[in-house]
């Protein structure tokens, strides 16, 4: 088995979240597990939770494109022909750009699950046999330790077939599981580096609880996008609900089941919205999962995940090591580090499977896959079409994970709608209603068809980005030889 394993909990900072917390995901949802002692924090995401884009009832959204910018192209060409490069540069910098405003948006963190174990002491000094790990052969994160003669264990995974993120708590020994649990909007991480305290003002929501679980419902303030998550619980202990908190006492086990959704739809004609009863949807998903025992959920997850992961094996002849992953990285020797290289290779496959699966309205892996702890992520955690989205999917086909690329293909197909406006306004190529007559994208993109150039010409003008992305799209056919998919999906994109 391929394992990441550590002998210390995650630091409660952005740096800790980024470099230490362990990621799980089912393509749509992602979570980072901190692996704490006497408490736990699981920060989670849902890939369609974004600010920016059109309002639900918008009639004038156009993908950020300014009007009539193509009219300067002839003047730029003339300046270049005359050798007046400075004039051409100035014209391009003034005209071949897009807006820098809130409508661009950013990928938002969804929320945090917190647990405080009322009969446990915090801190590494109060436990023995501490282990925090991620088995990437089964896509399960584990935290375990022994305190006062009782071993406590937590397993977390994000299931694609059951569409829930699951955390199972168990114990061996005399002590029971007694803990307080809550589910909140994103809470701030301790500042470090470039990330000061992140007081999020992008979302508003409310929490309601009963003995079955915790419901979080809200909206993104600037665009009205609706979201909801439901955290259900299944346990042999006593559960009480009060003021947004659940308290569990006297349990030998507890299974937490999380579902998170938004009303985003990959459909520009509906302003990227769909009519959905979010509360009923997330509760129904959790209740369906709750009807299954933990081992069934776990086995469903492993079987689905391994149907993709087990297709490729890499044996470089390395020797198995008892080192923690941190120690292995610090002592890496290119002549003897084959086992770490195997792990690194398979970890990349794990991350793609976990952040990109085919599902209705699914988005591709963004700059951070599906994982984001703050509401001001680097580069908005968006979709960069000048190399980064291509890079996400370069390994997909040659590593026998073609299915993970379908969300990327659908996303690029969707970009054509506002890409036709970009072609009209920046290249003078007119597309009448419904006519497939050419499309254009640039460096940055969002789930909302943002096709205009970036707000700085130096990095934002990238008119070949769609052609480059289409290489990734066409690779799906080259590796699968699916002629029906080529004819119905890929070829119309290529032709236009």
Question: What feature does the model see in each segment?
Answer:
Residues 462-496:
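Active-site neighborhood of glycoside hydrolase catalytic domains
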Residues 1-457, 475-477, 495:
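Aromatic-residue-lined binding/catalytic grooves and analogous aromatic/hydrophobic interfacial grooves
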